[in-house]
């Protein structure tokens, strides 16, 4: 947020991600799964899958992780987990964003309204004019609020490959920051396809440059194309593309350029950017 530049003169600022699936398994199943690079996963995913599936029922744990595995405090009071998430969200929107962004506190209801609209539809391509009209704010205010929600780790605002980056630039696709937020904030039925995409984007964004692909779902590090889907996801959208992969849910093992979703980011590499 705006306060980061002032604080950075006096302290080192870290952005701490919630549990990766690897960390979740290590914590809950007392495993010691190592960190690997994305390249290692792409080159050796079958051998890695075999080694892990022999140790743990990954698909059951992965389903649980998507619902309540991102924030470590789930194990303290499982029945109150979503209530605690909502309390944290309210704290960020009602206190932290106004203080750190200089937003008038009377506008926090607008920010919260925007967040819940995103929760109902994410991931989606935003129509800035319609969104600003629906909430009753200007275009620039809407873009500033979207930027604040992204910096607060409540949303992920992604641009298409080849796009520039600006605080007042319309995001090409909006996501909630992680799948647990989807289950906590959405009052409607959760679409599993949206959950898969949100998980994939969340796990990559802290360590890799991630963009919306022109041909598929995601374009990573200016090189790799990924299409995310269920176990029967076909390769039509990546045919003819180099360094292109299917990331499929509900499978324990992959083959060739089809990788299990649970494995694709079970080993998160060290960050390559601040």
Predicted regions and their residues:
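Accessory nucleic acid-recognition modules appended to NTPase machines
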Residues: 75-214
């Amino acid at each position: 947020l705006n306060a980061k530049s002032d604080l950075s003169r006096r302290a080192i600022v870290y952005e701490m991600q919630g549990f990766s699936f690897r960390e979740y398994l290590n914590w809950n199943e007392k495993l010691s799964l190592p960190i690997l690079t994305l390249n290692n996963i792409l080159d050796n995913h079958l051998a890695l899958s075999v080694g892990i599936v022999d140790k743990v029922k990954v698909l059951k744990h992965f389903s649980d992780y998507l619902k309540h595995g991102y924030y470590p405090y789930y194990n303290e009071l499982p029945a109150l987990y979503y209530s605690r998430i909502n309390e944290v969200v309210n704290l960020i929107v009602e206190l932290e964003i106004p203080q750190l962004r200089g937003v008038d506190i009377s506008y926090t209801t607008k920010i919260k309204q925007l967040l819940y609209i995103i929760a109902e539809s994410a991931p989606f391509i935003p129509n800035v004019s319609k969104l600003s009209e629906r909430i009753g704010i200007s275009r620039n205010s809407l873009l500033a609020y979207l930027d604040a929600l992204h910096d607060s780790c409540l949303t992920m605002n992604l641009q298409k490959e080849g796009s520039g980056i600006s605080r007042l630039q319309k995001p090409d696709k909006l996501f909630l920051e992680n799948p647990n937020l989807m289950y906590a904030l959405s009052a409607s039925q959760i679409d599993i396809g949206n959950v898969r995409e949100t998980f994939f984007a969340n796990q990559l964004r802290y360590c890799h440059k991630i963009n919306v692909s022109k041909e598929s779902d995601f374009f990573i590090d200016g090189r790799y194309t990924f299409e995310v889907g269920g176990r029967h996801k076909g390769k039509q959208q990546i045919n003819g593309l180099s360094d292109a992969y299917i990331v499929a849910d509900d499978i324990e093992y992959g083959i060739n350029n089809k990788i299990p979703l649970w494995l694709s980011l079970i080993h998160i590499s060290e960050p390559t950017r601040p």
